Structures are given as C-alpha cells and as structure tokens.
C-alpha cells in the first residue's frame, strides 16, 4: 500500500509525495483482479475528470510562455501534482510543448517546498540558480521552497492561492493575479 509505505519508510525528503496510481491499482484489483495497468490509469484519469469543475489557463499564460521562449529563456514546470491527473490537463490546455522539461511531484517522490524537489530540476539541467526565478502562486510551497535553494522568486496571487496567503518576501510580487507582468520585468 503506497500510503502505508510512504508513512512507514524514513524518507530523505521534508515534503514526501505519494504516487496515487498504486492506490487506484489496489482498489481496482480488489474488485477486478484482471484489470490492466492501462485501465487503472484510465480510472485515475476519470476520477479527475469527474471531480474537476473547470480547467483553464490563467489569462496571459500562453502569452508569457511564448514570450519567454522567444526571449531565449528556458522554461520548466515544477508541479505538486499527480501525473495521472495533471498530464491530461497540460495536454488539453496546449502548454506541454512550451516547457523545456516538466517535473511532477508524484514522479519524484517529493514536492515543493522540499529543496530536494528543486534540486532535482537544478541538477538535471545544470542550472545556475543566480539565473533562475521561480514563478508561483503559493508563498509556502513555491516561494519559500525557491528561497530555500537560493533562487529568486516572483509571487502572483491568484484565485487559487491559499486563503490568507501572506505576501512573501521575494523579488517580485503581483497581487492582481496577472501573470502577464512577467514579461515586463
């Protein structure tokens, strides 16, 4: 059981992350032992579809991603998410190809704000932290995590920022929810 494994194993991560697929697999196989891995995956995707009210990009997201790429910037996604839920949403919104690489926490065993999650990206791509900036909408997982590895950050308060999220101490703060400001800096 993935949940029991994660809670019982001493982990090197301060913010461990489970992969929900083994949980879906256990539930599905209990009722249908012959279910295929593909069917388990599809069941996980369907749970997300059924329980999600809306999937859309923030205004100016595509413009910012395109603008950064045109400016020669590398763009990476570091997401606290389950791949089974998130990948189809990234594809549906048409932004997968806008990233140079995508790191999803369920694949890595840890999540933001764990510095190790950031280090996996930094080390894989040999990034110079002084040349990087984390853009996020959560003062704890996004901004504090970036600061923990010495990375500058840009905070955008959005409709899904944690309620009463304090304005973080970081290089840039945009409280109007418009990620488009990124292109102005």
Per-region residue spans from a language model:
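Asp-based, Mg2+/Mn2+-dependent phosphohydrolase catalytic module
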Residues: 37-38, 42, 62, 66-69, ...
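N-terminal helical cap/lid subdomain that shapes the substrate entry/recognition surface
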Residues: 1-59, 63, 70, 84
């Amino acid at each position: 059981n993935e949940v029991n494994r994660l809670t019982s194993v001493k982990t090197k991560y301060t913010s461990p992350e489970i992969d929900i697929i083994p949980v879906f697999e256990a539930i599905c196989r209990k009722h249908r032992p012959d279910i295929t891995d593909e069917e388990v995956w599809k069941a996980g995707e369907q749970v997300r579809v059924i329980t999600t009210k809306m999937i859309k990009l923030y205004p100016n997201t595509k413009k910012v991603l395109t603008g950064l790429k045109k400016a020669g910037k590398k763009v990476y996604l570091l997401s606290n998410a389950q791949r089974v839920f998130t990948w189809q949403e990234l594809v549906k919104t048409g932004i997968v190809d806008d990233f140079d690489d995508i790191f999803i926490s369920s694949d890595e065993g840890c999540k933001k704000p764990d510095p190790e999650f950031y280090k996996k990206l930094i080390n894989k791509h040999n990034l110079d932290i002084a040349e990087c900036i984390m853009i996020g909408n959560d003062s704890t997982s996004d901004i504090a995590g970036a600061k923990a590895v010495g990375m500058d950050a840009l905070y955008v308060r959005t409709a899904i920022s944690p309620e009463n999220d304090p304005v973080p101490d970081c290089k840039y703060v945009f409280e109007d929810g418009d990620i488009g400001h990124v292109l102005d800096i």
